[in-house]
Every structure is written in C-alpha cells, then in structure tokens.
C-alpha cells in the first residue's frame, strides 16, 4: 500500500516538469528564430571597438558615425507637426516684407512750387538807357518719398515781351531729406534796353510811385533719386518794381 501511494505522488510532479521543459524549449526556439532573423555579427581587428549597446562582448566598426539609419516612411519624425502652418506663416512674412520694401522704395512724386520773388535789386545804366534787374526768386520743393532726393540742376529764363532778357543755371544744388520741404533760392540777372529802352525812361520817372513791369519766368528743375531722374518745369508771371530796390515781406 505504501509503495503504490508513492508512485501516485510522483506522477503529477513529473507531468509538471515535462510541461516546464516544453515551455523552455519553445522559448529557446523563439529566441533562436529571432537571432536567426537578426544575426549578431562580430567584427574583430584593429578597426573595431567594443559594442556599447549590445548584450555581449562583440565589436562594431570605428566608422560607426558613418552608418546610415533607415527610417520607415510612416515614422512620425518624418511628419513634423504644424508644417503647413509654418510654411504659410513664412509665405505671409515674405509677402509682408516685400510689400513694405515696395511701399518704402516706390518712387513718390516730388512737387516743385513757386514761392514768389523775394528780392529785386535795380541798377540803371544811363549811357545805354539800360535797366538791370537782379531778381531773387524762391522755389518750394516737397519730397514725399521715404528717402532723400537730390536737386541736380536748376535753370531759369526771364522774358519780357516774349524776349529772353536774362537767364540763370546751376548744378548740384542741395539734398532734400525724406518727407520734408526745402526752399531753393536763385538769382537771375535781367537786362532791359535796346528795343526796350523805353523801360528805362518809365522806371526813372520821378512822379510815379510804383514802376511795375511784368516779367515771365520759366524755371526747370532736375531731381534724381534711386537712379531715377525727373524734371519739373514752372512758368509764372511776376510784377516787378523797376524803380527802386524791393524786398518781399
């Protein structure tokens, strides 16, 4: 009776041991299949270093920094988040910068206005019955650009009765700052005599208080900015007192 009981006691233990052995063999087989799929290669020689990331004492080449990693196309690292937003923002910033550059550099108008005659100096030549007028006029130049402009030349003609009696020309006058106004003064010398010698007698009449004559002034101004040259012309009529020196208030 004792011997039979002992046999029955060892039989469940034997079955459990066989089951454990079967599981171990299956696990070992799976490990072998995994290793066969990704074989471990050991490099030996002078150009090898110890593998720091693998389990074991294998070696990998020293050219480890030159190894190329293959990343699947579905990897999220290849699809940064908000890419479309960043691209759209970059395009908008570029358009904004371009618009600002065009706005500030686009040539605006430079206006030239007549500011009147300021000073008239009168000289008489009695022998030749000649009246000499030194006429100082002023131009108002308004720069609407966001950069400076240069007044490169100015020329003026003084006419009396459709005849040129005086002229004035100058170059490299001034530089006008951005978004500002600038006054340019110039003096043209006019001589009225010869066929207009009657002007001398009119201007020297003592019993006339004001000796006004009408002169026609044609002025041309050249302005340069950013490689662009423009020309503005003015044509004005002025009353000039040829009897005495005068100054505009």
From Swiss-Prot:
Transmembrane segments: 86-106, 197-217
Domain of life: Eukaryota
GO cellular component: endoplasmic reticulum membrane
Location(s) in or outside the cell: Endoplasmic reticulum membrane; Membrane
Pfam families noted in UniProt: TMEM106, TMEM106_N
UniProt cross-references to Gene3D superfamilies, sorted A to Z: 2.60.40.1820
Membrane topology category: Multi-pass membrane protein; Lipid-anchor
Region described as Disordered: spans on this chain: 1-26
Keyword Endoplasmic reticulum: yes
Keywords in alphabetical order: Endoplasmic reticulum, Lipoprotein, Membrane, Myristate, Transmembrane, Transmembrane helix
Lipid-substituted positions (N-myristoyl glycine): 2
SUPFAM superfamilies membership: LEA14-like
Family (UniProt): Belongs to the TMEM106 family.
Subunit structure: Interacts with TMEM106B.
Name of this protein: Transmembrane protein 106C
């Amino acid at each position: 009776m004792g011997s039979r009981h002992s046999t029955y006691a060892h039989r469940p233990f034997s079955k459990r041991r066989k089951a454990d052995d079967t599981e171990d063999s299956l696990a070992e087989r799976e490990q072998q299949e995994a290793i066969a799929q990704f074989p471990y290669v050991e490099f030996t020689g002078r150009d090898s270093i110890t593998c720091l990331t693998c389990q074991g004492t294998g070696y990998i080449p020293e050219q480890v920094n030159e190894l190329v990693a293959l990343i699947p196309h579905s990897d999220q690292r290849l699809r940064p988040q908000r890419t479309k937003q960043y691209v759209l923002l970059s395009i908008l910033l570029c358009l904004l910068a371009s618009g600002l550059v065009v706005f500030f550099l686009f040539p605006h108008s430079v206006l030239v206005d007549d500011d009147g005659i300021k000073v008239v100096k009168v000289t008489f030549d009695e022998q030749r019955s000649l009246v000499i007028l030194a006429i100082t006029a002023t131009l108002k130049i308004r720069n609407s650009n966001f950069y400076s402009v240069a007044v490169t030349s100015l020329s003026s003609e003084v006419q009396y009765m459709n005849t040129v009696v005086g002229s004035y020309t100058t170059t490299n006058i001034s530089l006008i700052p951005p978004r500002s106004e600038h006054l340019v003064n110039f003096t043209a010398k006019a001589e009225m005599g010869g066929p207009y010698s009657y002007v001398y007698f009119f201007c020297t009449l003592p019993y006339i208080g004001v000796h006004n004559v009408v002169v026609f002034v044609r002025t041309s101004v050249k302005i340069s900015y950013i490689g662009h040259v423009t020309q503005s012309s003015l044509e004005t009529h002025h009353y000039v007192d040829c009897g005495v020196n005068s100054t505009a208030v």
